[in-house]
Every structure is written in C-alpha cells, then in structure tokens.
Amino acid sequence: MPRKGPVAKRDVLPDPIYNSKLVTRLINRVMVDGKRGIAANIIYNSFDIIKESTGNDPLEVFEQAMKNVMPVLEVKARRVGGSNYQVPVEVRPERRTTLGLRWVVNYARLRGEHTMEERLAKEIMDAANNTGASVKKREDTHKMADANRAFAHYRW
C-alpha cells in the first residue's frame, strides 16, 4: 500500500486503426517481452481473418465475444472460524474486462492452430458464438458461484 494515497489509474490510448481502448488492452495482453509491434500485427491479422471468415465487422465480433466471456460472479476465499469458504461475489466492471481478455488470450494460446493469428481469430469467433474454452471457463466460474450460494451471507 503506497503511503501517498491511492495510485492513479493509467488510461490506455485507443488503438490507431479501430479507435478502441478494448483493442489496445487486447494488444497489451498479447504482447510478450514488450514487443508491441508484433502483438499489434497479431491482433490486426487475426481481425482480418475474422473479417474474411464471418463477413462482419471484426470489432463487433470481438465486442460480442467479450460480452459472452466476461463473468458476472466469481468466488473468493473467506476464512471464518477456522475454515475457508468460497464466497460468491459480484465482479467489478474493470475486473470483468480484464478476466475476459485474459481468458480469451490464454485459451487462444492453448489451441492447436498453426499461428497465433489463427488461434486468436478462432477463439474470438467461438466466443462470439457462445462456444469455445473461454466461454466454458466463464460458465464454470458461474457454476462455482451458484454452487456456493449458501455462503453468500459471508460477503464483505
């Protein structure tokens, strides 16, 4: 905890092609070892693949995918009287976006396609259609929260 009060949240600049802050955050999530140019090329090439495959605007497909992946509830461990409970809590909007991006990129990396552009494009298209590993992760998170609804009164 810093002594001078809370740290100001840094604002990300919208990307130059799609003029979207969400795309910039996706580029930052894909970036490895500070190589932003390579990450941006991966994103833009995968958006081109999405445009060719679906014929729709890739930004709209990506935003729909994010809506389908972002969790509403999650569980947090809470220690009460010597035992740990998984307490369901609502997810803040900023964290929802962060988790959604993290899951899409992580599960795209685990896919079997040849290049990262193809993997990311397929994962985004699957998420937009409510299928794929990242949507399953969201469903599993919601199931965990639903299963532990009995401990909701331990919320803080």
Swiss-Prot record:
Keywords: Ribonucleoprotein, Ribosomal protein, RNA-binding, rRNA-binding, tRNA-binding
PROSITE patterns hit by this protein: RIBOSOMAL_S7
InterPro entries per the UniProt record, alphabetical: Ribosomal_uS7, Ribosomal_uS7_bac/org-type, Ribosomal_uS7_CS, Ribosomal_uS7_dom, Ribosomal_uS7_dom_sf
Top-level taxon of the source organism: Bacteria
Any one GO molecular function term: structural constituent of ribosome
GO biological process terms on file: translation
Gene3D superfamilies, A to Z: Ribosomal protein S7 domain
One Pfam family per UniProt: Ribosomal_S7
One cellular component (GO) term of this entry: small ribosomal subunit
NCBIfam families per UniProt: rpsG_bact (TIGR01029)
Subunit: Part of the 30S ribosomal subunit. Contacts proteins S9 and S11.
HAMAP family, per the entry: Ribosomal_uS7_B
Family to which this protein belongs: Belongs to the universal ribosomal protein uS7 family.
PANTHER family according to UniProt: RIBOSOMAL PROTEIN S7
Main function: One of the primary rRNA binding proteins, it binds directly to 16S rRNA where it nucleates assembly of the head domain of the 30S subunit. Is located at the subunit interface close to the decoding center, probably blocks exit of the E-site tRNA.
UniProt name for this protein: Small ribosomal subunit protein uS7
